């Protein structure tokens, strides 16, 4: 699952995240964030819940708003993408500089994340200090041919992303 974390702790806290769900697992709300990090506005309440908070699998930048993800099971893209996850980052509104506005890729091995998120589809944000953006990715799905569709509610478009045999340089 993807999680958009709380606001009000600064530009870089707490991280949004992507993680698997454990039955009966506690992920911190509202007493802790990203593992056993106490929410300072709760003044140490419920330390027993803070201690049992599960640390998520993958940190994403704070306030980037991960809205959707899709696991890649196709064969159109290079083999390195198979089994990994594409995650849409809708973008920020409450940071001193904009961030997000892209699709990232998280590699997987043996059903678990095996690396950090890396940029896959970018270009919606003109510059971090500029308040103007070209679009905001929302959803991502894989089509039967292995290409991806990415919805964009800022640009009011649906983008088809396919692989043509060469890597971008």
Predicted regions and their residues:
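Beta-propeller domain segments
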Residues: 1-135, 161-169
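Blade-level signature of beta-propeller repeat domains, shared across WD40, Kelch, NHL, RCC1
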Residues: 141-169
């Amino acid at each position: 699952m993807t999680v958009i974390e709380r606001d009000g702790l600064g530009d870089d806290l707490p991280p949004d995240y992507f993680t698997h769900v454990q039955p009966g697992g506690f992920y911190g709300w509202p007493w802790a964030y990203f593992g056993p990090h106490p929410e300072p506005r709760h003044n140490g309440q419920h330390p027993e819940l803070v201690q049992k908070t599960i640390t998520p699998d993958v940190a994403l930048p704070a306030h980037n708003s991960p809205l959707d993800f899709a696991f890649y099971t196709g064969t159109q893209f290079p083999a390195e993408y198979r089994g990994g996850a594409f995650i849409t980052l809708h973008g920020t509104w409450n940071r001193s500089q904009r961030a997000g506005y892209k699709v990232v890729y998280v590699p997987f091995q043996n059903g678990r994340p095996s690396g950090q998120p890396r940029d896959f589809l970018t270009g919606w944000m003109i510059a971090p200090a500029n308040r103007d953006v070209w679009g905001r990715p929302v959803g991502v799905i894989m089509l039967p041919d292995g290409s991806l569709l990415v919805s964009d509610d800022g640009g009011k478009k649906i983008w088809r992303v396919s692989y043509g045999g060469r890597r971008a340089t």
